[in-house]
């Protein structure tokens, strides 16, 4: 399993970004339609189901981290490692589904948990199998499969159900679950050929029980870190849902979703570079991570300024006056979102490449505690704006702490992490910009 070169990474990043952009565009269109059809309360139910389903993603993150570490750092057989990972995924899916069904327990006010429970095992498998595509350098293939199902394809299906069929919320949610089922089934095709032959003996991973035990030990810490990260990222949503009206939850989640549109670039870079960071030597992986972090934050600053200026106006004109309060909330969220866009890259290096999932777990626990305490302290007197301020404070703190630990673990100077460099611009684009500037100077003379 070889890492792609710089041109290959750029190609994969652009491909990932294009598919994410397609998915985001379709998701925004579907979101507008569902918000207008079902109002803030219905929008809140749909958003909350998606947020609850993220627990499947965090569980899969632990499995993915363990697989990437065993294949990338320990050089184990990919086939043997994945075979053990499937057993771990089955156990996690069973536990997660049962837990969500127990929380729902037939309560009509908790239907979000029912829909999330139905999609949970398929989502977990889909997220976990993504690491096979990353390590086997088949990112474009899984991008297309995801875009056609849980990405743009699923959103377009929801859009059609709402605008053409005028389907009720329950039918829309069933269709939402069905897209995860389809995506999980489709993603399994071709994996056997990608994995290659299985190895034998300790050098290739050892007995399945030994591989599984090591995965459980490593993956449990990585999954716990990912879960705590998610809770730190979304504890404000749970508190808003518990303390304020459903309509307020719908407004708040819309502000969050609007801000997270900026994360398309960072998600594309993280997804396409994960296999490379896992398999490169430590120094090269650290240099790549630092370059991506400083480049992403620089891009997000520009995007954040534009979204702060246009976001509130777009929300009112696209979603309706009932969601106008989301505009000021969005502006309060943006500073933290700009910095938090690099969190995934920093966390991946600390947990997977440096092999310190326990350290990451500790950092995320601190972030969760800070965000929860600040949200509880501010939501009473300031409402949604208090929750947004608490969220931003937690994001900024998390970024500063993780940058510090990344610098220590990798030996990278802070300047190389924080300050963009001319070399960060792709060579072809840099040469074109240089030629354009020279042409302008010549014309002025």
Where are these regions (language model features)?
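Hydrophobic alpha-helical transmembrane segments
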Residues: 113-117, 145-196, 366-370, 384-408
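Transmembrane helix-bundle signature of multi-pass secondary active exporters and lipid flippases
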Residues: 49-58, 252-271, 300-303, 333-340
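Membrane-water interface segments that mark the loop-to-transmembrane alpha-helix transition
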Residues: 11-27, 48-107, 111, 276, ...
């Amino acid at each position: 399993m070889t890492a792609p070169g710089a041109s290959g990474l750029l190609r994969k990043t652009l491909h990932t970004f294009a598919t994410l952009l397609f998915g985001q565009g379709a998701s925004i269109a579907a979101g507008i339609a569902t918000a207008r059809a079902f109002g803030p309360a219905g929008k809140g139910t749909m958003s909350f189901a998606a947020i609850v389903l993220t627990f499947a993603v965090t569980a899969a993150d632990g499995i993915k981290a363990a697989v990437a570490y065993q294949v990338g750092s320990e050089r184990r057989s990919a086939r043997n490692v994945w075979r053990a990972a499937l057993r771990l995924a089955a156990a996690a899916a069973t536990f997660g589904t049962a837990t969500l069904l127990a929380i729902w327990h037939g309560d009509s006010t908790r239907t979000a948990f029912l829909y999330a429970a139905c999609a949970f095992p398929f989502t977990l498998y889909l997220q976990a199998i993504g690491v096979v595509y990353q390590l086997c350098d088949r990112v474009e293939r899984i991008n297309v499969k995801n875009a056609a199902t849980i990405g743009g394809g699923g959103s377009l299906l929801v859009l059609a159900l709402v605008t053409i069929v005028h389907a009720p919320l329950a039918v829309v949610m069933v269709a939402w679950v069905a897209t995860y089922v389809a995506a999980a089934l489709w993603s399994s095709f071709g994996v056997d050929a990608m994995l290659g032959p299985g190895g034998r003996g300790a050098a290739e991973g050892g007995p399945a029980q030994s591989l599984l035990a090591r995965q459980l030990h490593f993956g449990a810490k990585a999954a716990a870190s990912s879960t705590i990260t998610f809770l730190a990222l979304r504890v404000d949503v749970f508190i808003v849902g518990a303390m304020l009206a459903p309509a307020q939850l719908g407004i708040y989640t819309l502000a969050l979703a609007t801000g997270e549109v900026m994360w398309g670039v960072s998600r594309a870079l993280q997804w396409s570079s994960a296999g490379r960071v896992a398999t490169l030597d430590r120094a090269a992986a650290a240099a790549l991570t630092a370059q991506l972090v400083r480049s992403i934050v620089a891009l997000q600053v520009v995007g954040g300024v534009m979204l702060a200026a246009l976001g509130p106006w777009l929300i009112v004109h696209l979603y309706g006056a009932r969601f106008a309060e989301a505009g000021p909330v969005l502006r309060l969220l943006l500073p933290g979102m700009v910095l938090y866009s690099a969190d995934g890259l920093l966390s991946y290096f600390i947990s997977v490449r440096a092999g310190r999932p326990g350290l990451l777990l500790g950092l995320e626990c601190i972030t969760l505690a800070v965000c929860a305490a600040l949200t509880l302290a501010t939501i009473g007197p300031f409402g949604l704006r208090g929750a947004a301020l608490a969220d931003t404070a937690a994001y900024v703190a998390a970024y500063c702490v993780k940058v510090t630990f990344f610098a220590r673990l990798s030996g990278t100077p802070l300047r190389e992490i924080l300050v963009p460099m001319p070399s960060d611009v792709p060579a072809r684009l840099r040469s074109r910009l240089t030629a354009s500037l020279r042409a302008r100077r010549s014309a002025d003379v």
